[in-house]
Each structure stands twice: as structure tokens, then as C-alpha cells.
Swiss-Prot record:
HAMAP family: Lgt
UniProt topology in membrane: Multi-pass membrane protein
GO function terms (MF aspect): phosphatidylglycerol-prolipoprotein diacylglyceryl transferase activity
TM ranges: 6-26, 48-68, 84-104, 187-207, 214-234
Biological process terms in GO annotation: lipoprotein biosynthetic process
Organism of derivation: Finegoldia magna (strain ATCC 29328 / DSM 20472 / WAL 2508) (Peptostreptococcus magnus)
Known pathway: Protein modification; lipoprotein biosynthesis (diacylglyceryl transfer)
Protein's name in the database: Phosphatidylglycerol--prolipoprotein diacylglyceryl transferase
Keyword set includes Iron: no
InterPro entries: Lgt
Function: Catalyzes the transfer of the diacylglyceryl group from phosphatidylglycerol to the sulfhydryl group of the N-terminal cysteine of a prolipoprotein, the first step in the formation of mature lipoproteins.
Binding residues annotated for a 1,2-diacyl-sn-glycero-3-phospho-(1'-sn-glycerol), in chain numbering: R130
Enzyme class, UniProt record, top EC level: transferase
Domain of life according to the entry: Bacteria
Amino acid sequence: MDRVAFSIFGIDIMWYGILITLGVILGYVVAVKLAKMENISENTILDILVWALPLAIVGARAYYVIFEWDYYSKNLGEIIDIRGGGLAIYGGIIAAVITCYVICKKKNLKFLKMLDIFMPAIALGQAIGRWGNFINKEAYGTPTNLPWAITIDGVKVHPTFLYESLGDFLIFLLLVYVFKNRKKFNGQITSMYMILYGILRFFVEGLRTDSLYIGALRVSQLVSIAIIIAGVILQIKYKKQIIKSDEK
């Protein structure tokens, strides 16, 4: 499948960008619906998104470029060209979370409450955006003879984009269910996302052939471990607070 969806005035519009845009739009719709359940206005969601989205893209690109600096130091003109890929999701999430924190402080909003609203939307956006990797023929895995293998350059490989896309979608469904039916404290949905996505990404990353490295270590696996631990700590901390509150 061609990476280029169509051209306008000689400018190629890539499928990668279209899928990311679709993920953002559907994620926004989800966030607005969840926000209404918390009596938070659509304008508040939009105010955060206007800043978080572009900074997330910058963060995702910066993260990727930093760990591929040997290449980009010799090709500086390509640093800002993201039409063909080269966005690292962890960099984007970190930038978006920091942005959300700053805005919440300025607007006197509960930070974890807002993150709980955005996390299901992020998971859905990831599930959709991963298909851009399929079209770009990137982020695939090691050779395999499994029935669902895809063929890249004549070699059957693990469709790791598909593993993560399906995993992200299942995480999205679970987070929405818990948000609507079983949420007990602010930060619950966020910590669930951290644990579930961290586990998913750790194992999927182990199959990929294009991982970013620090020495012999895969960067995303190290980040995944840190995020899982942080998510578990967050869950334990607030569950203890609930137990103490119930005992009073």
C-alpha cells in the first residue's frame, strides 16, 4: 500500500498523518463524553488539547531524534519531517502529561482527574495510529512462520503493530468500563493505563527489530518497567487512602 494517500497542490498527504488525525478526533470525542460524567466542560478539554497535542508531537519527535542522533546529526533537515513516521509514543505521552499538569495548575483543576479522562482517549488513538506503521512498513517484528505473519521484503515477520493495536483497543475498552462503572479514586484509570500499557509495550518491544537502544538495552522496555512500577505505586497509594477513609 502506498504511503501517500493523495496530493494537494503538489503536497503529499500521508496515510500516517491521516490515521493520527483520525485517532486524535475520535480520542477527543471519547474525552468529551467522559468529561461530562465528571461535570467538566468540553471547553476545558479543548483548552488542554490545544496545547497538549502540538507539544505531544514535538515530544514524540524529540524523543525519537535523541535516540537516533547519529543519523539526524548528519541529516539535520530531516528532523522536522514527520510525514513518514519517526514519532515515539512515550515521548509524546510524557510531553502531553507535563503540559496537562501545567494547565491544571494554572486553571486549578485536579490533575489526576483530568488524566483519567484522557487516558482512554490516548489508548484509542494509539490503537488507530499503529496502523500507520503497517502502511509505512515499519515497527514490525522478528521472522516467524505463524499463520498471521505479514510479509515485509519477502520475509514473514510478526505484525507487532497489530499486536499493539489490538492490545491498545482492549485497554481502551477496559478503561472506559472501569471509568463508567467501577472508578473509586482519581488516578485509578491513569494507573491502570500505566500498568497495562507498560506490560503490553514491554513484550511487544521485545519482538520488534527497530527498537531505540541505550547501549544493549531497549529504551522502550526500560521506560515500560518504570511506568509499570509508577502505576503500581499509584494504585497502592490511593487504595490505602480509601481503606483508611472507610475505617473512619
